[in-house]
């Protein structure tokens, strides 16, 4: 009996030695303004690990702390971190396969522009299509066996960001709600409210794609500067106080070409004035314009669908809420409702068109009143108009559905298979390559850190003590 107890205790000791003595030490994070900072001491005798969870609006700073008096070098793997990284590894090493970060996850904005290669900057992203971890290693040349881990962890999101993507991107590479392609002039209308995040993108997220030749974002630092009333260039800080734009206007992160054509604005929780602003994407002779209607609160203009331009049906015609905004009616919901309730009166709509063009004619009002009381004809026209409205609605819904899916057809989808899609398919069932490593039970239970054994160790020790007391 005693011999079995000793054998049991020996195996328990070896088990604990493996997972306690050799697990990584997770370093704490420090918050400073919009920065989330984690520092690693590469001269430490224990393998250290920094894990930062994605949070949009944050800038993540990893520091591989170097004692410059030692005159020793630090080594970073992959050597082009953050352009290349390891993904979804528990404990990667120098022989682990590298991936091109932006092929797999094009919305990640990160760089290492430090002369001594000891600082790494990343922006938190507003959208992630999957659960994924990006990892780099840093260590001292005098202690090459102790490799420290820096990790960015992303959780899958189901809700995309309000905004306009003019990059003709497939759904897997599109994080904005509205998709347009710059093969013709187009416009995109977004209605925003306090606390919303809004985005614009001009870039087709495929490396070296000819679509990206001769691209221009106007203004080139949208949303830092925006067009007010279509042609007046103003600072968003003055138009929408307390708003914040990502990427920030600083030299902290040197943007790649791809990330120079995308921008996000975070609206404050309180907005005092309704404002209409715009930015545009240009490709050769084609222009795609994004109109952003920022409201102080949700009212009759509130949109509950898929962020394409709302319309109120007037007989067999349509009047857009963008037009209502231009008329100055956004502050008068009663007048808007009056317009909608009179939709069977075609002359009333024509009257509003004249009003919009500042060409008011009193005779139009008299004609509209006369026709509105013309019984049988009005009823016949109303019935006919209802049919036209239904047909127009079906047509618009079909167009909206097409726009939402990025204006690409089945053949285009077969041809433009993205690097991300190839990677995703190659690591799943039906491929001869090994499956990509998934999150383990312990990672889901205790977090994404490679040191998830740390909590498991406590349970193990408690379990062994209980067994020991029972057997003793």
From Swiss-Prot:
Species this protein is from: Plasmodium berghei (strain Anka)
Effect of deleting the gene: Attenuated parasites that cannot commit to infection, even when they encounter with hepatocytes, resulting in continuous traversal of hepatocytes. Cells lacking both PBS36 and P52/PBS36P are severely affected in their capability to develop into liver stage parasites and abort development soon after invasion; possibly due to the absence of a parasitophorous vacuole membrane (PVM).
Superkingdom field: Eukaryota
GO CC term, one of those recorded: plasma membrane
Lipid tethering residues (GPI-anchor amidated serine): 449
One Pfam family cited in the UniProt record for this chain: s48_45
Signal peptide per UniProt: 1-23
Assigned keywords, A-Z: Cell membrane, Disulfide bond, Glycoprotein, GPI-anchor, Lipoprotein, Malaria, Membrane, Repeat, Signal
Membrane protein topology class: Lipid-anchor; GPI-anchor
Disulfide bonds listed in the record: 64-138, 81-136, 164-188, 202-281, 222-279
InterPro entries reported for this sequence: 6_CYS_dom, 6_CYS_dom_sf, Parasite_Repro/Invasion_Surf
Domain 6-Cys as annotated: residue spans: 24-157, 160-299
Known function: Involved in sporozoite infection of hepatocytes and replication therein.
Region (Disordered): 359-385
Name recorded for this polypeptide: Sporozoite surface protein P36p
Compartments where found: Cell surface; Cell membrane
């Amino acid at each position: 009996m005693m011999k079995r107890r000793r054998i049991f205790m020996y195996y328990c000791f070896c088990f604990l030695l493996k997972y306690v003595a050799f697990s990584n030490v997770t370093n704490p994070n420090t918050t400073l303004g919009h920065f989330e900072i984690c520092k690693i001491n590469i001269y430490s005798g224990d393998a250290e690990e920094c894990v930062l969870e994605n949070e949009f609006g944050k800038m993540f700073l990893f520091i591989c702390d170097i004692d410059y008096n030692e005159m020793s070098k630090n080594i970073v793997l992959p050597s082009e971190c953050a352009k290349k990284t390891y993904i979804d590894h528990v404990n990667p090493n120098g022989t682990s396969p590298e991936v091109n970060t932006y092929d797999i996850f094009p919305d990640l904005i990160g760089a290492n522009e430090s002369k001594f290669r000891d600082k790494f900057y990343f922006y938190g992203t507003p959208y992630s299509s999957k659960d994924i971890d990006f990892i780099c290693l840093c260590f001292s040349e005098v202690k090459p066996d102790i490799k420290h881990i820096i990790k960015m962890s992303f959780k899958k999101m189901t809700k995309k960001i309000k905004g306009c993507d003019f990059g003709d991107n497939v759904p897997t590479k599109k994080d904005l709600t509205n998709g347009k392609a710059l093969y013709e002039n187009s416009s995109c209308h977004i209605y925003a409210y306090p606390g919303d995040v809004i985005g614009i993108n001009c870039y087709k997220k495929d490396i070296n794609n000819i679509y990206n030749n001769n691209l221009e974002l106007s203004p080139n630092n949208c949303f830092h500067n925006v067009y007010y009333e279509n042609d007046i260039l103003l600072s968003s800080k003055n138009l929408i106080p307390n708003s914040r734009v990502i990427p920030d206007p600083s030299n902290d992160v040197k943007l790649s070409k791809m990330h120079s054509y995308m921008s996000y604005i975070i609206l404050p929780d309180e907005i005092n004035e309704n404002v209409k602003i715009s930015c545009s994407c240009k490709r050769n002779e084609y222009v795609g314009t994004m109109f952003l209607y920022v409201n102080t609160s949700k009212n009759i203009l509130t949109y509950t669908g898929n962020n394409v331009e709302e319309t109120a049906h007037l007989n067999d015609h349509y009047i857009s809420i963008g037009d209502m905004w231009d008329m100055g009616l956004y502050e008068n919901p009663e007048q808007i409702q009056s317009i909608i309730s009179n939709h069977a009166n075609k002359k009333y709509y024509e009257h509003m068109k004249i009003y919009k063009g500042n060409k008011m004619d009193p005779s139009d009002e008299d004609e509209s009143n006369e026709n509105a009381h013309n019984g049988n004809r009005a009823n016949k026209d109303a019935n006919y108009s209802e049919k036209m409205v239904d047909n127009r609605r079906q047509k618009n819904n079909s167009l909206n559905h097409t726009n939402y899916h990025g204006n690409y057809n089945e053949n285009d989808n077969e041809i433009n298979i993205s690097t991300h899609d190839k990677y995703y398919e190659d690591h799943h069932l039906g491929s001869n390559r090994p499956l990509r490593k998934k999150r383990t039970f312990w990672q889901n239970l205790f977090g994404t850190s490679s040191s998830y054994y740390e909590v498991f160790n406590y349970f193990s020790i408690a379990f062994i003590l209980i067994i020991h007391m029972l057997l003793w």
